[in-house]
């Protein structure tokens, strides 16, 4: 059975990228990257609501907690780790949790994302409070973790 999620499908625009010249590879990647602003623009209302939710969370003393698996989790941890040096925030204000724990930052932890119970346990371990905002990051939108 073939996985129908868009994140698990081949991109027809990059199907033969491995056969392309270096310059053509750059052109293919640049063409795909140019699609991002339109995608962001199409979700601007949803993104604005997320920003407003984060602002409200911070104003009442809550934390922003990213949670995700694999690359999605790594990006959450990366963003959280950049907040103190970039914006001077307390390291507790924005946190990142990745399925499989710190080891998953450098090596794949297969199966760590497969149960919601792992996510609940990790959120409990960080001392999740009612005033916190949790943002789950998943490319497919279907990862249990």
Regions found by a protein language model. Name each.
Residues 1-39:
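Cofactor-/ligand-binding subdomain signature composed of acidic, glycine-rich
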Residues 36-45, 134-143:
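Short, glycine-rich nucleotide/cofactor-binding loops
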Residues 82-134:
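Glycine-rich oxoanion-binding loops at beta->alpha junctions
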Residues 72-78, 130, 137-145:
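Short glycine/serine/threonine-rich phosphate/pyrophosphate-binding segments
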Residues 51-104:
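Active-site cofactor/substrate anionic-group-binding motifs, chiefly glycine-
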Residues 24, 49-53, 118-122, 145:
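Well-ordered alpha-helical segments embedded in enzymatic catalytic cores
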